[in-house]
Amino acid sequence: MDFANVYLGLDTLGNEGYGASVSNGTHHDFHFNFNTFRDGGNHEVGEKRAESSDIGVYECRGPVQGPKDQTSFPSNSHNNYASIVGDASIGHYLKGPERTSEVSLPQTVNLSEISNNNDKGQPTNTPPVRSTIVAPSLYSEGSTLNHYNNGSHQVLHPQFQNGTNAPYVVQSNLMQNNVNLTGAEQEKGLDLYKNSATANNDEIFYNLESLRREGYLNSNKKQSQSPNGDYNSSDESCSNKTVASSQRRGTPGSNNVHTASNNETPDMKRRRFLERNRIAASKCRQKKKLWTQNLEKTAHIACEQSKALRILVSQLREEVICLKNQLLAHQDCNCEGIRQYLSSEAQGIMSFQKH
């Protein structure tokens, strides 16, 4: 059971603080009694109680004080109320002077800031953080503020009744800095974040597409052009032959083409020839790619067939050896064929040894 979570859970009135009086309990049913107070030390009539089997009997006298991230906070006896807010790790809590033994809390509590209360119960630093933001699920559903103000008792949420559960910690600095924002302002900020994220994604996608297109065009230009930037002489000769043949035909279309070619500037002719060269090179690359793929498929099929044949040869050799062993095993039988085979094999072995 986290000691500070009890305070955060009861902090539903905004800037009002809460203090803990001396707790009472038995061996198996411990509980804390909490009295609320406003600025000026005016106590509310209602009394709150938080029950849990993991809560020990602690005497929470005096204000909890200490710098940020300090783990030990002494307790004074002149004040019966303590308000806990802030970003600190509370590892243990000390009892009053009449009980000098140190009492360890089950878990470490992470808060946002530490503020002290004077004898009148007025906060000197930062007001308490609202529990609806820091610990919204501390109490069970269905509980209201009027229910607490009427002096009724409320049991903690089941998830906080187990000592092994970690306390509810706000890990984002953005949430700690904007705890006073309303729900509408938070939704507005979330919408702005979504819109900005969508705009950034669209911009990144547009930039990637433009870079891809430019890189594709540049790669084609590099592949089509020679190191000196000259076009292919064969394509140029082919284009010249085409123009000459069209001129020999003497058709009106050929005359128009001849007139257009005469009106072209050297740069325009160069672009046209380079475009034809790119088209021819692209077709050549496609044919080469198809030929390579077909060759790879043929080689793969041949390799598979060779592997299968090698396996078959090894199996046949094993079968021949097995048959020879069977013949040797039946050499004492009255079979003329077996005897002739064994004698021929023996003569072959003897002749091989002589040579």
Curated annotation (Swiss-Prot):
Top-rank taxon? Eukaryota
Bias class Polar residues marks the residues at: 218-265
Where would I find the bZIP domain in this sequence?
267-330
Q: Which InterPro entries match?
A: bZIP, bZIP_sf, bZIP_transcription_factors, Leuzip_Jun
* Main localisation: nucleus
Q: Does the keyword Transcription apply?
A: yes
Q: Which intervals of the chain are annotated as region Leucine-zipper?
A: 309-323
Q: Which UniProt keywords apply?
A: DNA-binding, Nucleus, Transcription, Transcription regulation
Q: Where is this region: Disordered?
A: 218-271
Q: Which GO terms describe its cellular component?
A: nucleus
Which cell locations does it reside in? Answer: Nucleus
Entry-linked PROSITE patterns: BZIP, BZIP_BASIC
- Short name of one Pfam family for this protein? bZIP_1
Q: Name one GO molecular function term.
A: DNA-binding transcription factor activity, RNA polymerase II-specific
**Which Gene Ontology BP annotations are present?**
regulation of transcription by RNA polymerase II
Tell me the segments the record calls region Basic motif.
269-307
* Membership in a protein family: Belongs to the bZIP family.
Q: What is this protein called?
A: Transcription factor atf21
- What organism is recorded for this protein? Schizosaccharomyces pombe (strain 972 / ATCC 24843) (Fission yeast)
